[in-house]
């Protein structure tokens, strides 16, 4: 029936690094000062209609602050919440973190990998901000061909901050590319001013995965004009992508955005279920996804000061996960139960 780890009925990403490397690896969110091509006029202006990046990263991660300082402060921040964490992943999260010349990207990525407690990088970006040369470099980094002496230097790193030896199973820096795809529907992507198509996303994911780079994707549930049925229909397309992991976030209406004005003008254009309905909706999605796809997140949190309403109240992610486990058991269902190999193509 199902044989997922951690006693789950879905393929939870929780514990993935512990199983692979023998310890928990915590992410440190960084702001490296990037922008996006739909903000600076390259493919558009104003950015995505739902976006205010300040709502999505912690206080220690601020533009202009040196990256190694962000890492040190991030480690101190995370040690309060996760005191047993010993090594970290540098998470380039703000805006599009491959949007720049390759020489600049190399300098930034290799700078954070020089930190003695950082064992890998997670790069959040857009599918229209990668190319063959950038992906070849990342593949070389992940395989150990680039920075060939990195692991030896890390294991010999002096200093009181190093708490534990590097896992023996680690042979090169961990490299993950996480694409903001947001929707499989081109009409939605145009509506929210993304500036790229789903086919662009498909090609980027395929180019990344075929090089052996761990590849993830992010989707928003409830964008304007998308019905529950449309969101379920895209599960086949998501499963057809060579992704290792996926994140789902419910749409949150962030103050000061174009989408806040749009929502105020016509709330009926948005599918925004209450928490109870959302749990069933997420399960309906899980049932239709291929079972080997890791589920990294099923809901998002934004600090209350950034959102114009909180239909669920102040429910934390860990509580949502607890309720999800309970509901899966009540429905006696699991990830992939209704999965079938999708046909090729895309929705419009």
Where in the sequence are the language-model features?
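N-terminal [4Fe-4S]-dependent radical SAM core
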Residues: 1-89, 348
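Hydrophobic faces of well-ordered beta-strands that scaffold small-molecule active sites
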Residues: 26-30, 88-90, 121-123, 175-179, ...
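Core AdoMet radical
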Residues: 54-74, 82-102, 117-130, 148-151, ...
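Distinct, well-ordered alpha-helical segments
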Residues: 102-110, 131-142, 231
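Short Gly/Ser/Thr- and charged-rich N-terminal loops/segments
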Residues: 152-163, 171
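Conserved C-terminal portion of the radical SAM core fold
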Residues: 199-259, 276-299
């Amino acid at each position: 029936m199902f044989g997922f780890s951690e006693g789950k009925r879905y393929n939870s990403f929780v514990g993935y690094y512990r199983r692979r490397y023998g310890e928990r690896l915590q992410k440190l969110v960084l702001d490296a000062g990037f922008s996006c091509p739909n903000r600076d006029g390259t493919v558009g202006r104003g950015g995505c209609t739902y976006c205010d990046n300040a709502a999505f990263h912690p206080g220690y991660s601020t533009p202009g602050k040196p990256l190694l300082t962000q890492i040190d402060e991030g480690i101190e921040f995370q040690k309060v919440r996760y005191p047993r964490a010993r090594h970290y992943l540098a998470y380039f999260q703000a805006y599009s973190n491959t949007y720049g010349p390759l020489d600049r990207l190399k300098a930034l990525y290799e700078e954070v990998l020089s930190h003695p407690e950082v064992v890998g990088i997670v790069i959040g970006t857009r599918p229209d901000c990668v190319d063959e040369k950038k992906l070849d470099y990342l593949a070389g980094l992940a395989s150990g061909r680039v920075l060939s002496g990195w692991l030896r230097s890390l294991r010999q790193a002096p200093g009181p901050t190093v708490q534990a030896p590097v896992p023996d199973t680690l042979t090169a820096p961990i490299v993950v590319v996480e694409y903001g795809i947001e929707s499989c529907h081109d009409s939605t992507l145009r509506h929210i001013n993304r500036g790229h198509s789903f086919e662009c996303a498909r090609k980027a994911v395929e180019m990344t995965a075929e090089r052996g780079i761990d590849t993830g994707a992010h989707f928003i549930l409830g964008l304007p004009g998308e019905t529950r049925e449309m969101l379920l229909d895209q599960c086949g397309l998501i499963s057809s992508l060579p992704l290792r992991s996926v994140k789902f976030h419910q749409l949150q209406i962030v103050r000061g955005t174009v989408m806040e004005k749009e929502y105020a003008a016509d709330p009926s254009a948005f599918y925004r279920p209450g928490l109870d309905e959302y749990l069933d909706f997420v399960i309906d999605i899980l049932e239709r996804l291929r079972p080997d796809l890791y589920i990294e997140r099923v809901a998002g949190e934004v600090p209350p000061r950034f959102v114009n309403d909180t239909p669920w109240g102040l429910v934390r992610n860990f509580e949502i996960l607890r309720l999800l486990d309970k509901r899966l058991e009540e429905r006696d269902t699991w990830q992939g139960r209704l999965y079938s190999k999708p046909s090729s193509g895309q929705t419009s």
